[in-house]
Amino acid sequence: KNAEFKQQIGEDGKKLKEINTSKSGSTTTFQNDVYAQNLNLDEDGIVNLNGNFKGDKIDFKDNTTLNIAADKNITSSIVSQDDNIGQINIAGSTIISGDIADSLNKIRAIKLNGRNSNSTFANDTYVKDLDLNEKLTLNLDGNLEANNLNFNKDATVNLADGKNMDAKVNTLNNNEGTLNLLGGSTIVKEVGTDTNRLKEITAGKSGDSTFNDKVYAQKTTINGNGDVNFQENL
């Protein structure tokens, strides 16, 4: 059955041990902040976090959809008990402080929305498809391992110094999407295509950066004291 919790649950320093939710076909909504060691998403229902979450982990045990409201943050890791399960929808600016999944058990999809929003993934992210659905900014302060990073609108991705991206980078429309390397990074897979090129790539600020596969962009800016290596066509 559906459930709605209107008041804050727990408090910092006095967290609940566990919350079990997301029964098949159900919708569970938390209207305020939630403090719990573990938020278990047990089946393929829907969970709406309209407040902040603080705990040890959010645990995808099945193909749950997790909706995170704009301007709300997740101060925990997010784990998955199987590969290619779970979807995270982010409505606007959000900070996720912990790792998102792992290399063996990737989240099925993460979808960022909210025009002009600015979100940060503070640690490593493992996902099948990472979709940027509006003109927004995503700061990747950890590594990204994914099948696809999809620029579905003219979004911007900032990859932190010393972090790497192992994902095919796609843009839905030619001349949309900006990828900024803020230091030394390795981009493992192809960036763009000959018909749908990214708008811009910037690199070279510091350190050594390497693009291991083909790169297609309308503009590539190399500016700074770093070295940029292209192993394939530019």
Kindly give the residue locations of the regions a language model identified:
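Short, T/G/N/S-enriched strand-turn elements that build extracellular solenoid repeat scaffolds
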Residues: 1-13, 17-22, 27-42, 47-61, ...
